[in-house]
């Protein structure tokens, strides 16, 4: 790996240099941002929307699946700890492909081994791209038309899933529309941004980003009967993960190392997952660049090689301990946008971008441990996941179109997006090169 910069730039958040990483600790290198922390305590439980995938496709009981998600959520903290200025998430658009892959194996240890093989390969691809620094070259060398096509494929994939036969839009249409509509309004409406300057309530709603859209979706869902009434489990306060059961029933130590044939079968999908996740690096680069332009009091260092390494570590650790079908991605687009928009409001709103993102994910980890919070918000897991996905679709569509400057870019990106969303990377690459 090339020599890593160790000199801190002017106005850059303090850190401890550690190879390619920049170690930062809460309360020492950055302050906890209260707004993001409160959002994380409430919105963080949406991480448990992954529980149904672990139950349905890996055959895990609810309590064990919850324990696996706690470990996955803890690993979110690696990004802020190691100097990656993002709110990390899943590689969500690959989930339908992962499910199809898993269904090719019988339920039980064999299917869990298949998930281990896939996630381990995904982690190794991320790490390879980070160690060789090919990620930096890849991000800057890929033509704008291809970047646009990759990003525009996300809304096609997301909306196809949400509007499909088993999509959540058929289960919770009014709740989702209410939540997504409000989130888009407070994020992109020029009129709303003008009115919030003179209206304290509108300003409060906007400052808390995703919080009010989720709460509105919950209220609407309850009123129209799309959601069950929330319960409040009183008694034990903190969920202790079932570490022994995880090691015995889910980890590579319990189910065994996957055979070579599984790795061979998983390799094409692992490469597809990376190509799709690549769009998150493009999105992050754009969002960080916009944040830099909005403020000159802090230098924000986004390095795609570092981001690859951290994402790779998360996937590699999970593949060994608690394989995770949504996979570990470099970005939760919706929340990263929400935090960066508040950051742009100035130092009084948020001192540090990384501090805001770290505060959210620290609270996320705490929220999935607090049993009363999890039990209360459990009915909205599916709706919250859909709001996040659909907002991501809007953001990716905006940024993808921004990359298309010429008519040729627009033609290539449009066709590539459609082919990538429906047929995969091989066909999409052929169209891009044609």
Protein language model annotation of sequence segments:
Residues 1-62, 198-302:
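Helix-loop-helix hairpins and the membrane-proximal interhelical loops
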Residues 17-32, 39-51, 79-151, 297-393:
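Helix-loop-helix junctions within the multi-pass membrane cores of secondary transporters/permeases
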Residues 52-56, 76, 80, 414-422:
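Generic transmembrane alpha-helix motif of multi-pass integral membrane proteins
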Residues 52-66, 101-114, 164-167, 263:
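Helix-coil boundary and interhelical linker segments in multi-pass alpha-helical membrane proteins
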Residues 58-81:
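Loop-to-helix transition at the N-terminal end of transmembrane alpha-helices
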Residues 62-70, 146-148, 260-264, 299-309, ...:
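Membrane-interfacial loop-to-helix junctions in multi-pass transporters
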Residues 111-227, 355-434:
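Membrane-embedded alpha-helical modules
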Residues 134-142, 159, 163-166, 236-260, ...:
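Hydrophobic alpha-helical segments of integral membrane proteins
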């Amino acid at each position: 790996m090339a020599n890593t910069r160790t000199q801190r730039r002017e106005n850059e958040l303090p850190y401890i240099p550690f190879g390619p990483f920049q170690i930062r600790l809460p309360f020492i290198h950055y302050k906890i941002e209260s707004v993001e922390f409160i959002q994380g305590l409430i919105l963080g439980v949406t991480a448990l929307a992954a529980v149904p995938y672990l139950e349905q496709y890996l055959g895990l009981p609810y309590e064990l699946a919850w324990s696996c998600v706690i470990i996955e959520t803890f690993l979110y903290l690696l990004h802020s700890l190691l100097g990656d200025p993002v709110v990390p998430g899943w590689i969500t658009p690959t989930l339908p492909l992962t499910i199809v892959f898993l269904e090719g194996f019988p339920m039980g240890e064999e299917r869990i081994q298949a998930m281990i093989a896939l996630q381990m390969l995904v982690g190794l691809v991320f790490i390879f791209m980070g160690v060789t620094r090919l990620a930096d070259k890849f991000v800057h060398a890929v033509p704008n038309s291809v970047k646009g096509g990759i990003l525009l494929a996300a809304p096609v994939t997301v909306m196809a899933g949400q509007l499909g036969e088993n999509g959540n839009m058929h289960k919770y249409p009014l709740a989702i529309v209410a939540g997504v509509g409000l989130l888009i309004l407070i994020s992109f409406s020029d009129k709303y941004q003008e009115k919030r300057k003179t209206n304290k309530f509108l300003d409060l709603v906007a400052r808390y980003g995703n919080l009010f859209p989720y709460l509105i979706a919950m209220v609407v869902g309850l009123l129209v009967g799309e959601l069950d009434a929330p319960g409040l489990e009183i008694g034990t306060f903190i969920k202790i993960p079932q570490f022994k059961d995880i090691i015995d029933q889910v980890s590579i130590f319990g189910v065994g190392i996957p055979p070579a044939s599984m790795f061979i079968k998983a390799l094409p999908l692992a490469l597809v997952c990376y190509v799709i996740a690549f769009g998150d690096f493009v999105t992050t680069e754009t969002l960080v660049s916009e944040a830099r332009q909005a403020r000159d009091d802090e230098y924000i260092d986004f390095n795609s090689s570092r981001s690859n390494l951290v994402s790779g570590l998360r996937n590699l650790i999970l593949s060994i301990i608690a394989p995770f079908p949504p996979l570990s991605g470099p970005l939760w687009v919706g929340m990263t946008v929400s935090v960066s928009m508040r950051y742009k409001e100035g130092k009084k709103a948020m001192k540090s971008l990384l501090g805001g993102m770290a505060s959210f994910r620290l609270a996320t980890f705490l929220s999935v441990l607090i049993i009363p919070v999890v039990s209360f918000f459990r009915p909205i897991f599916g709706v919250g996941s859909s709001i996040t996905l659909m907002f991501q679709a809007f953001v990716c569509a905006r940024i993808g179109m921004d990359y298309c400057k010429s008519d040729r870019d627009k033609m290539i990106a449009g066709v590539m997006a459609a082919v990538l969303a429906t047929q995969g990377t091989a066909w999409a690459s052929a169209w891009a090169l044609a």
